[in-house]
Amino acid sequence: WKIQLENTTDGYHFPMVHKSWMASVDSETADMMSFMEDPQAETHALGNGHSVGIMATAHVDLDEDDGTEEIQPRFNHLVEELEEAGESPERIRRYMRSMHGCGFNLNMFPNIAMSSAFFRVLIPISVDETEIWHMALGMDGGPECVNRERLRIHEHFQGPYGFGSPDDAEGWDRVQIGAGGNPDMPILINRGLNREYRTENENWPTSHVTDETGMREAYSMWKKMMSDD
């Protein structure tokens, strides 16, 4: 279950493991998730094993909108439907900017995660088996057409026929096989230690979203809970 927990705030794997998904979406969505060289894309260790990874910085707070972001053409049919329903331009813009969910992934130690627009519950079955529940998130009271489209986006990534989850699962299987080849081999989680710093107000350990700050936080808490100290 720990490898699935790592996955949520690990930005490093995304462009490689999810290359097929990136190739299957429109260029605007792919650009939105191109955070490898974005200095504002960071992971914060929140304490008690929790962490948050900022993936799409422009969508972290939907109340902050300078008006420069263009609505993705793939959602033009929704814009037209909402205009016909009498929705204001401001509300329509907010709906469209929220189509992919929030701009961050949140890990709640030990087994709950929220990734953009879905919840994930990790249920350990044995040392080498984990059951994962995915729950798509919609808008409470939001337009039906918007929630329907968000569900289609969820299905495109998740599920056995999605372009995202099957690649994650394949990676998890290979990591499990590799770890079983030498159980005594130490596994390093030191990526980004050289550039990790603490935020001024919260004192959160922080580094780039492609670093392993969130993993170090989770394993530190796991080690603490498993000890007799």
Identify the role of each PLM range.
Residues W1-D229:
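C-terminal catalytic domain of Rieske-type non-heme iron oxygenases
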